[in-house]
């Protein structure tokens, strides 16, 4: 009995000795870490890790010490150990996930962050790190989603959490446009502009297009005016603004000026020459419109059914009816669904509205 008691005392003494030594090493390691003596901290925590093999805090601070010392591989290895030992810890998982990102292991980082969000870590939703993790998850899911609507949903969830990069707003607004959600285009473009005023040269052109599609002509014109104030040579704006004015038969003098500037900078672009021709057509300057249209048709890649129909209209106004019908027939060949063109051919004239 006496031998057993002696053995137990010796065993407990050894245990308390190890515990005391571990506690002392932890204090020394933390002291070195706080003093930013990361080399010393690494030595201490490495020694401690050999004794406390199941203590996640040891590997966590060892990883942070390696990270501060710019030894990313060792930092990642120890952060993973801390995370595996305590998968419910937000801090351990966050460090591991960030190191995975630094190592471009994006899928593993996504899985790590998704697991963190699944745990009840008693974190507030508005904490910066929580927001950052959620935004990464939503952005990753958005990038992976195959359906445009799903992409848009995830990107918006990321944006609604707080400030995001300008690039994300561009993606959201472009998806709104592709999904034909013009009201959403306006809403999100204005929100992006409020958060990032320097996005004005990109936002105002798409606002002009969206307002025009929604039938808000005055807002469209105002947006295009602001776009040109930000970038007077924006060819997209010069083209769309002048074309929209021409089909509305409004501010034709402005449309004339804008389209002239456009083709001066892009003298061989068929689409832009077509816009110029149509402005001239609405101004009843038919000989000039014909010259512009024939130049547009030399751009074979952009010689669309629309261009051929417009060319036919110009020729008709010049009383070249047979040539007009030939042009309309070419338009119908390129796009057989154009009932308006078929009607022009059958009537041998442009129907009056």
Question: What is the role of each PLM region?
Answer:
Residues 23, 57, 91, 125-129, ...:
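Start-of-helix register in tetratricopeptide repeats
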Residues 53, 87, 121, 163, ...:
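Short coil turns that delineate tetratricopeptide repeat
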Residues 61, 95, 129, 133-136, ...:
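Canonical tetratricopeptide repeat
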Residues 47-50, 80-84, 117-118, 159-160, ...:
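Conserved structural position within tetratricopeptide repeats
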Residues 34-35, 68, 102, 136, ...:
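Register position in tetratricopeptide repeats
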């Amino acid at each position: 009995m006496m031998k057993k008691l002696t053995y137990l005392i010796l065993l407990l003494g050894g245990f308390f000795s190890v515990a005391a030594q571990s506690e002392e090493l932890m204090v020394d390691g933390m002291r070195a870490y706080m003093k930013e003596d990361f080399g010393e901290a690494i030595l201490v925590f490495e020694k401690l890790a050999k004794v406390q093999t199941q203590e996640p805090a040891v590997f966590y601070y060892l990883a942070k010490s390696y990270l501060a010392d710019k030894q990313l591989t060792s930092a990642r290895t120890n952060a993973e150990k801390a995370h595996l030992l305590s998968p419910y810890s937000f801090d351990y998982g966050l460090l591991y996930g960030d190191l995975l990102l630094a190592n471009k292991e994006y899928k593993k980082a996504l899985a790590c962050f998704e697991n963190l969000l699944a745990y009840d870590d008693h974190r507030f939703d508005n904490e910066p790190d929580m927001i950052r993790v959620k935004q990464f998850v939503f952005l990753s899911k958005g990038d992976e989603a195959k359906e445009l609507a799903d992409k848009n949903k995830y990107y918006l969830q990321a944006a609604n959490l707080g400030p995001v990069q300008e690039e994300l707003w561009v993606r959201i607004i472009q998806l709104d446009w592709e999904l034909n959600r013009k009201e959403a285009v306006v809403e999100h473009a204005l929100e992006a502009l409020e958060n990032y005023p320097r996005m004005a040269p990109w936002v105002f052109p798409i606002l002009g297009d969206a307002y025009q599609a929604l039938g808000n002509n005055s807002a469209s014109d105002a947006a295009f005016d602001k776009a040109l104030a930000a970038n007077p040579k924006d060819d997209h704006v010069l083209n769309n603004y002048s074309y929209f004015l021409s089909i509305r038969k409004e501010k034709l003098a402005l449309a004339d000026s804008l389209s002239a500037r456009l083709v001066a900078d892009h003298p061989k672009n068929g689409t832009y020459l077509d816009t110029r021709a149509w402005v001239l057509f609405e101004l009843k300057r038919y000989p000039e419109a014909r010259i512009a249209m024939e130049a547009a048709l030399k751009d074979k890649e952009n010689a669309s059914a629309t261009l051929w129909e417009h060319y036919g209209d110009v020729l008709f106004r010049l009383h070249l009816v047979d040539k007009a019908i030939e042009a309309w027939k070419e338009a119908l060949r390129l796009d057989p669904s154009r009932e308006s063109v078929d009607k022009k051919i059958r009537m041998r004239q442009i129907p009056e509205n």
